[in-house]
Amino acid sequence: MTQAASAAPSWSIDPADVARFSAIAAEWWDPKGKFAPLHVFNPCRLAFIREQALARFDRDGAARAPFEGLTLLDIGCGGGLLSEPMARLGFAVTAIDASEKNIKTAATHAAEQGLDIGYRPATAEQLLAEGAGPFDVVLTMEVIEHVADPGEFLRTCAKLLKPGGIMFVATLNRTLKALALAKIGAEYVLRWVPPGTHDWKQFLKPEELRAFLAGEPVAMQGPFGVAYNPLTGRWSRSSDTDINYMMTVTKD
């Protein structure tokens, strides 16, 4: 959930958010712990990534590892909740995060699962400066609302995307509905996530994301809304983009 940190370039990093997620790093793989909402959300976002990537790369969804031969960068990987299923789908996964504690948790769990994932504590800026990539797929899921400079962060992520590739961005919309439900409701009423997890002022409107990338050689698609059904306890795609939404970015 947070991006990476080190002595390397890290101007988009918010140290307070890094510390907040580091403090609960051991709970990433506990489906009933502090990251329980992400475990519930994961099937919806995984299905979206898989569907869009199959179409983008013209791959056979019935194959055991349909994305074999493709590279993927998971920025702000947290404990690896997305990195692991992406590796199982055949991607060669590089995963970075701001918190060394998150990376240690993720690497330990991947080793227990017999998965080869390139985890490292590093920033997107650091990877770009090193000349890493570019990657066929870049994930920045529920990350951009936690960084200090979202515009610079998103442009850096786009530069790490290979021509012909696709980037996924998931975040929260800065609406009164999101303030009431995703901030006050989720943190202080339902206690789904620890208080202080989000700052409503850092939520982003879809048009702001488009503006961030206006000068880049990319195209942005979406928003694609996602909504939670309290009766079923599941997330699904929705026409409602007032709270949670995803965008895709393609480079041709």
Swiss-Prot record:
Q: Where does this protein hold S-adenosyl-L-methionine?
A: 45, 76, 97, 141
Gene Ontology biological process terms, A to Z = methylation
What sort of enzyme, by top EC class, is this?
Answer: transferase
Enzyme Commission no: 2.1.1.222, 2.1.1.64
Where does the signal peptide begin and end?
none
* Reactions accelerated catalytically: a 3-demethylubiquinol + S-adenosyl-L-methionine = a ubiquinol + S-adenosyl-L-homocysteine + H(+); a 3-(all-trans-polyprenyl)benzene-1,2-diol + S-adenosyl-L-methionine = a 2-methoxy-6-(all-trans-polyprenyl)phenol + S-adenosyl-L-homocysteine + H(+)
CDD domains assigned to the protein according to its UniProt record, in alphabetical order: AdoMet_MTases
Gene Ontology terms, MF aspect: 2-polyprenyl-6-hydroxyphenol methylase activity; 3-demethylubiquinol 3-O-methyltransferase activity; polyprenyldihydroxybenzoate methyltransferase activity
Q: Which cysteines are joined by disulfide bonds?
A: none
- Gene3D superfamilies from the UniProt entry: Vaccinia Virus protein VP39
UniProt pathway annotation: Cofactor biosynthesis; ubiquinone biosynthesis
Under InterPro entries, the record lists:
SAM-dependent_MTases_sf, UbiG_MeTrfase
The keyword Methyltransferase is annotated on this UniProt entry: yes
**Keyword annotations from UniProtKB, A to Z:** Methyltransferase, S-adenosyl-L-methionine, Transferase, Ubiquinone biosynthesis
Name the family: Belongs to the methyltransferase superfamily. UbiG/COQ3 family.
Role? O-methyltransferase that catalyzes the 2 O-methylation steps in the ubiquinone biosynthetic pathway.
- This protein is called what? Ubiquinone biosynthesis O-methyltransferase
